[in-house]
Amino acid sequence: MLDAPSAPAAGLQIETGSPVIRLTRLRLLDGAPMLAEEIWLPYDRFAPLATLELDAFGDLLYPLYESHCGQIIASAEETLTAEAVNATYARLLRIQPGDPVMVIERVARGYDRVPLEWRRSRGAAAHFRYHVDIR
């Protein structure tokens, strides 16, 4: 359990300093890092995850949220931006500090529209592809 920094708190619509759970993941494709993720969850809704063994976490988190915490993600909104990567994320993504990365910020909500998850994912811009189907 951590105190929520300002950006995750704003995304989750909770007070800065409120108790949260922070998950970090490195998403791989054929052994190469594609995305470095930080995921923030309000502690009061996701407390069972704080004591869960690491091997219980799979690739898909939303089914885990439902089965262990009773929280169902109904929708999500994403914002894409670009930035120069810092040394920490450069090391994780195996790129050089200052290289461009795409940043995806996601707010996932329950059926009641209350934010349940705030996520920030970073991936090397060289590997990034965006596709949208507009009808």
Where do the language-model regions lie?
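All-alpha effector-binding/dimerization core of bacterial HTH-type transcriptional repressors
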Residues: 1-135
